[in-house]
Amino acid sequence: MSNVDSEESPQETTCEAVVLDFLAHGRSDDDRPQYQKDPLAYALGVEDFRLFECTVDGDATVAIGDRLVVDPPADRSPEVVSVRAVEHGDLSGGAQSELEYVVEDVVEAQEDRFVEFYLEAQPVTLRLHQLNLLPGIGDKLQEGILDERRRGRFESFEDVEERVAGLHDAKGVIVDRIMQELTEDDLKYRVFARGE
């Protein structure tokens, strides 16, 4: 767990995050009296799928699905007081159950970005291709995707599914891989979710 406040990036791009859960009375495992607890929001970064715990201004109202700017500190949404990066196990139960739905919404909203992955995926090692990192994609499907992308660009997930025999849920495969990267700490390769 690191403080996002202390990280400075050379290029000041804003990091937008979708709220997964809002705890108006803070964490339940916090033993302080209720009036001393700060409201918290758990959020998922839209670009790099980082998980955040945001301390929220006591007067602000935040709902699940709201979008907040969490980084850099100068550009933060007014309701966000502080932000820290967290791991999947640190999320509240509500945030954990909401996570897959939000990931699916992000993938759907940025379909071009993820279809581009099918077009741009490269070998990781001599024996392993980025496409093989996706759940359910073995050598046969990998070859099918590579053959079809040589013939022409994929326009959408539907186009990928129509042209590649055996690949029935192009979006679901991406969502499953992102969920693996968010929930499993011991993955050697990360394609979508930035590791801390």
Can you annotate each of these PLM segments?
Residues 107-111:
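A short alpha-helix capping/helix-coil boundary motif
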Residues 1-106:
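Structure-specific DNA junction-binding interface
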Residues 106, 135-136:
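Short, Lys/Arg-enriched anionic-surface-contact patches
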Residues 112-133, 143-196:
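C-terminal extensions
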Residues 138-141:
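Small-residue hinge/turn detector
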